[in-house]
């Protein structure tokens, strides 16, 4: 099979700001290279040093890495620790009990502050309450809860008693929740009466009741309900209990359950190509080490920072950079219940000013939607807010188009904040390829270089390295501590999905088409391998075509998919959102031609979309991710048969289906 072609060439480069570089933990490229070389010289010794420096161990480990049952690797296997202790107790013991752990802002703007001492007490009370209901080490607890302090408390309490949590995003349907409860074999469920988002309520408890009524959930003996709104709920006596009632008389102290380094901390479900969700299982020590270390490296965390990751705890970003990473280093962080556009599209920028956020981490999808709003109304433009507290800004979830990167850099970072464009996955646990704010010169659209200790490479379909400048498949050549350990209950699927025989069985397959720059060696993600289009024998990454479209002055957002074509094999279909109102009729046809010509100029005639459809927005999940599988069906003219329960804006499907 021919190589994936990289056809979009970005040459703009931005050096780390002098003030950031001077104060950074990793200052300058020489410091970065020294760490990377240490890892290459003594791989196990490098990771062992970090693990001893970063975590507190009840029982020290001996050997760092056990490769005897590859690809089911073990790290620090004979050591013992507790994740909750490392996130809470050790900071309180160090005299930081009065440091603010969480600044929680509710959907309606109400703000609450929780200290480390408060959070430890709340976690301990809930942990004691769970233990009294027979929940403990080895049990699985499903958490279906809104963005809240209570959500963090529930996760940390599970870790404290050795139970393995599985958080399900609050936007999932009863069917999706049911599948996960059954697959993981949960003995308890933690939920809420209702969820508040954008001024609207979502009845979580009734959705949970529907899921439990579908059968196969007999192991669930306890349903803990957090009272968020006070809305009416059905009640199952003996099974259902109020969170505030069961913790009321519990002790503020709960001895941590000391567990082995490989003890499953959590199982997080991610969608699979076969339709059955994959329960990605993460360890305790290796995972916690890496989310703490990347807080220090990627975000250059300082004790006086106010950190804000806008993700939901239902996704891995919320696990790693809300519930565990920030707390593991003793950070003060903002946790937000709502959405970026309520009550208006200036909400993020107002909150940055209100809470003096210094490190801000959000998704390219959110940035692109806020660009459109800012272009239409200067009152919600970042320039109308005080963003002077910011020093580092980041992106997560998908590659960021170069033009969106430039807007973010100019208008949010005020051309003085480095952007950390982070590449990683649910399965990797934490950041893998990313700029370091005080070391790496950044290039719009590129995640730049792997972190020290991460042996990333670009290979062909046989696992052989490809030359820089030639597109290929992103892999990681050596195991790392935070990697997923297995797919819950399906180790063969784990091997087949991530360590396929076609690549020799020892390379971690990331599933992303990637190219390295000929000169810098920087990595640029070109899109999922599944999203590579074969147009007249040319294999094109969708990301580059989307970036070309978004670079046009009229375009706010674009998503590109393929559909079968008798002439070219596959045709490029683009779904486009403009910075102004959606065009129709002749105006739409003329603008489609303009954009086709634009892509031809930016990339080449081969990449021109055959079909361009304009929408008021794109189909997205409640977490802001574009649902490309739905766009593929629309492009082919097929009926939508997939689960759309997480779709934020169902009406857009009809609009995009009508447009031809």
Curated annotation (Swiss-Prot):
CoA binds at residues 197-200, 317, 536. SUPFAM superfamilies: Acetyl-CoA synthetase-like. Keywords: Acetylation, ATP-binding, Ligase, Magnesium, Metal-binding, Nucleotide-binding. Mg(2+) binds at residues 550, 552, 555. It catalyses: acetate + ATP + CoA = acetyl-CoA + AMP + diphosphate. Transmembrane segments: none annotated. GO terms for molecular function: acetate-CoA ligase activity; AMP binding; ATP binding; metal ion binding. ATP binds at residues 397-399, 421-426, 512, 528, 539. InterPro entries: Ac_CoA_lig (IPR011904), ACAS_N (IPR032387), AMP-bd_C (IPR025110), AMP-bd_C_sf (IPR045851), AMP-binding_CS (IPR020845), AMP-dep_synth/lig_dom (IPR000873), ANL_N_sf (IPR042099). Acetylated. Deacetylation by the SIR2-homolog deacetylase activates the enzyme. Its EC number is 6.2.1.1. One of its GO terms (cellular component) is cytosol. Its cofactor is Mg(2+). The modification N6-acetyllysine is found at residue 625. One of its GO terms (biological process) is acetyl-CoA biosynthetic process from acetate. Belongs to the ATP-dependent AMP-binding enzyme family. PANTHER family: ACETYL-COENZYME A SYNTHETASE, ACETYL-COENZYME A SYNTHETASE 1. Catalyzes the conversion of acetate into acetyl-CoA (AcCoA), an essential intermediate at the junction of anabolic and catabolic pathways. AcsA undergoes a two-step reaction. In the first half reaction, AcsA combines acetate with ATP to form acetyl-adenylate (AcAMP) intermediate. In the second half reaction, it can then transfer the acetyl group from AcAMP to the sulfhydryl group of CoA, forming the product AcCoA. This is Acetyl-coenzyme A synthetase. It comes from Burkholderia thailandensis (strain ATCC 700388 / DSM 13276 / CCUG 48851 / CIP 106301 / E264). The gene is acsA.
């Amino acid at each position: 099979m021919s190589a994936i072609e990289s056809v979009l060439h970005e040459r703009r480069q931005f050096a780390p700001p002098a003030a950031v570089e001077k104060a950074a933990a990793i200052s300058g490229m020489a410091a970065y290279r020294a760490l990377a070389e240490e890892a290459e010289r003594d791989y196990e010794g490098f990771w062992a040093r970090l693990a001893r420096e970063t975590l507190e161990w009840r029982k020290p480990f001996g050997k760092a890495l056990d490769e005897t049952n590859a690809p089911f690797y073990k790290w620090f296997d004979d050591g013992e620790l507790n994740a909750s202790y490392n996130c809470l107790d050790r900071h309180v013991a160090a005299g930081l009990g009065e440091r603010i752990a969480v600044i929680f802002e509710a959907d309606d703007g109400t703000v609450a502050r929780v200290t480390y001492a408060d959070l430890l007490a709340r976690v301990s009370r809930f942990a004691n309450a769970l233990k009294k209901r027979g929940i403990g080490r080895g049990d699985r607890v499903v958490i279906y809860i809104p963005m809240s302090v209570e959500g963090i408390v529930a996760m940390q309490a599970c870790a404290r008693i050795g139970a393995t949590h599985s958080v399900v995003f609050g936007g999932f349907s009863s069917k999706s929740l049911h599948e996960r409860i059954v697959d993981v074999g949960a003995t308890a469920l933690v939920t809420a009466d209702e969820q508040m988002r954008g001024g609207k309520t979502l009845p979580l408890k009734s959705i949970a009741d529907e899921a439990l009524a579908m059968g196969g959930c007999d192991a669930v003996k306890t349903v803990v309900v957090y009272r968020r709104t006070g809305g009416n709920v059905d009640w199952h006596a003996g099974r259902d209990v109020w969170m505030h009632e069961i913790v009321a008389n519990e002790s503020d102290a709960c001895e941590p359950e000391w567990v082995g380094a490989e003890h499953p901390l959590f199982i997080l479900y991610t969608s699979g190509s076969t339709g059955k969700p994959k329960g990605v299982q993460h360890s305790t020590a290796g995972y916690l080490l890496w989310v703490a270390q990347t807080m220090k490296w990627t975000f250059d965390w300082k004790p006086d920072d106010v950190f804000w990751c806008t993700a939901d705890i239902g996704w891995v970003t919320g696990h790693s950079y809300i519930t565990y990473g920030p707390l593991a280093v003793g950070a003060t962080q903002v946790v937000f219940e709502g959405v970026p556009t309520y009550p208006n599209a200036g909400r993020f920028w107002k909150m940055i000013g209100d809470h003096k956020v210094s490190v801000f981490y959000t998704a390219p999808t959110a940035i692109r939607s806020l660009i459109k709003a800012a272009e239409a109304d200067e009152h919600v433009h970042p320039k109308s807010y005080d963003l002077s507290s910011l020093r580092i800004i980041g992106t997560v979830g998908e590659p960021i188009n170069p033009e969106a990167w430039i807007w973010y850099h100019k208008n949010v970072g005020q051309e003085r904040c480095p952007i950390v464009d982070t590449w990683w996955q649910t399965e990797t646990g934490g950041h893998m390829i990313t700029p370091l704010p005080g070391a790496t010169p950044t290039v719009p659209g590129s995640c730049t270089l792997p972190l020290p200790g991460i042996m990333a490479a670009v290979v062909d379909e046989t696992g052989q390295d490809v030359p820089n400048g030639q597109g290929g498949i992103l892999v990681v050549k050596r195991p790392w501590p935070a990697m997923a350990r297995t797919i819950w209950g399906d180790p063969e699927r784990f091997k087949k999905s991530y360590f396929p025989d076609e690549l020799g069985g020892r390379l971690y397959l990331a599933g992303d088409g990637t190219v390295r720059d000929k000169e810098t060696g920087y990595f640029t993600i070109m899109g999922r391998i599944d999203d590579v289009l074969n147009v007249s024998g040319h294999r094109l990454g969708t990301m580059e075509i989307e970036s070309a479209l978004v670079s046009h002055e009229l375009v706010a957002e674009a998503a590109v998919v393929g559909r079968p074509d008798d002439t070219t094999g596959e045709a490029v279909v683009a779904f486009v959102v403009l910075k102004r109102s959606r065009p129709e009729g002749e105006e739409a046809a003329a603008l489609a031609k303009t954009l086709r010509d634009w892509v031809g100029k930016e990339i080449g005639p081969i990449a021109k979309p055959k079909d361009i459809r304009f929408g008021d927005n794109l189909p997205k999940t409640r977490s802001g991710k574009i649902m490309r599988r739905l766009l593929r069906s629309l492009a082919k003219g097929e009926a939508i048969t997939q689960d759309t329960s997480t779709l934020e804006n169902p009406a857009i499907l009809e609009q995009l289906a009508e447009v031809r």
